[in-house]
């Protein structure tokens, strides 16, 4: 519904055109218009902050209040027709001063007055003493209380002839105003809210001076104030403590229209900002709008404040302006907080999302540009809140600002912590990777590298990178934006990683040294055991020096072992010094090296003492002593040699090695080396991880084994088995030697060849003299030589044997076929069986005799 000439009434959700001339704030049924904020936005008052002023006009019904406002401020409040006497303004209406506004389309032209204050809002209050409401003064009192709680200036519109009257001069209304003012002040004793009562005397004729009329009105007001029942503590208060008074007179509008317009124009100049001049006894200079009149409600919160005030009034609740101001401040601060947080979310949510996704993926990422974004977002958010909310109740504003900063800082702190965590994790990972890569690069180049220098450089770079990322994320002016603790934790973790990398590098160093020890011991100890298989002197002795004694083999092995480990310890210590390793770490490394070295030696000894290897070395040792003389010359066995004696001596000498090798004992002390002293005690700084890959050592560790058991290389059962097997091998060598001696006796004597040459001389001469025989002999000799050079004698003999065997079988078959039909068949069958039996005995014959003569006899019997 549009009433009062393009005014939006209460409850009317109209279009913007309905607000062209104003809005009904409260209707005649005491309903507040919830669209007041839309009207203020339409009139562009909302962003004005405190730069607005509110005026309310009071007066009896049909006294020309709306007419006065229309002429003063260019408004379009509905006025009463001259031919009628009835209520025109119902409820409370509001319009903005039009005298300073640019002309809108279809609007009446108004005088532009740049001297008036900005954003003057005028409330036209329903007139009093109307017949429509009669004796019902409830709305009158409520509207007065509402106007006094919200307005800076209360214009009292009276006629000149009403001055001196009680009802006609609205003294009853003014008494109500004074009463509600005391009510308001009683709730707000911390301040004295002041208001201006501006009396506009209409139809002024000039007969009675304005000063006299002013005095009359002030006397009446003093009497009313004196008659009021004042609250405790305010009995001696004066009316001037709460109100200022201004007076103006206007000629008759109808009888003196030109003069009326001129005086109205002069009156408009008073509606601008003014101030009190302390040097002139607080005399007001400038306009009537003094700072102390303003209710300090920002324009963007006025609609909510006014609605809250009216709700308290209409429900007959005690009006508590400070409480209402606080409630308004809370409401508006919450609204402003939500508004500024929208822009904050737009700037920060993308970073929060990206950080959360990176954290969920397990790869935290240092977000570029996070620091500036956090700084700008926080500064804009707080600044925007301060700009809009600082005009409200200070305590509420400070509280809400603290709440907003806490919300913002909570999210920014989480981002800050996430950024530092990402920088921490990525920095640790990059540091570890960089050190590892630098070490590998140094290893590939084959040159020595300073591990401590690498760690120091990479740690410095990691700290610089972390501090750079942290400083870039710092938000100045916040208590939580401090990364001292995180930096200390980062440094601590870097030290942990450095120590772990150093420990790993020392493990790798120990592994390399262990391989070197394994190689050296494998070669040196292998040579010592190989020397057991070279028991002969002379040409079989070492190139330099004498052949080492077999009795001192363990002494030599222990000496080699100790020297090798000492050399390895020196290498380890020198290399570890470049790691910046502590003495405790070096001690642990050396202790581990000695234990590992003993394990290497024991493994090598076990390898050499394997049954097959040791049996081979014992046989070689026996053969060197049995088959070679003291000068290292091989023996040619003859029947006259004492083979049994040499065999027994060599065998017994070799058998003495088995008990010697079965236990690791030093010759001087005839006891095992003090392995426990050599290994040393476990360092106090050793950790379980340092011991988990170490094999237990008997006599050193509490594993149940003694040092004697640790130094036992061959058990008793293995010794006995090895002795038996060696004796069998030695017996085989002895039998072979005996055969060799006997074989020398069955050789064809030399004189036989001389006799053969003498008896066959004639045949030899005949062959040499006959060219045909000689040529045939020459061809046979050449063929035999070529066959020998091509190594074909073996295949040819095998082929001849196979061919002869095949021919023999074929002949036997044909003979059987020939004899079977004849009477000689049974005899042939019996002959066949006897032949087969002979063939079997012929096969077994070589196993019964080893002499060549026996073989000749078998062939003769065949």
UniProtKB/Swiss-Prot annotation:
Chief location category: endoplasmic reticulum
Keyword field contains RNA-binding: no
Compositionally biased tracts (Acidic residues): 852-862
Protein topology in the membrane: Multi-pass membrane protein
Membrane-spanning parts: 748-768, 772-792
Subcellular location, record wording: Endoplasmic reticulum membrane
Residue ranges of every copy of the GB1/RHD3-type G domain listed in the record: 49-306
Keyword Signal: no
PROSITE patterns according to UniProt: G_GB1_RHD3
Disordered as annotated region, ranges: 819-862
GO molecular function, one term: GTP binding
Positions in the Cytoplasmic compartment: 1-747, 793-862
UniProt keyword list: Coiled coil, Endoplasmic reticulum, GTP-binding, Hydrolase, Membrane, Nucleotide-binding, Transmembrane, Transmembrane helix
Any GO CC annotation of this UniProt entry: endoplasmic reticulum membrane
Lumenal-facing ranges: 769-771
Binding site for GTP: 59-66
PANTHER family per UniProt: PROTEIN SEY1
Role according to the record: Cooperates with the reticulon proteins and tubule-shaping DP1 family proteins to generate and maintain the structure of the tubular endoplasmic reticulum network. Has GTPase activity, which is required for its function in ER organization.
Protein name, as recorded: Protein SEY1
Organism this protein belongs to: Uncinocarpus reesii (strain UAMH 1704)
Gene for this chain: SEY1
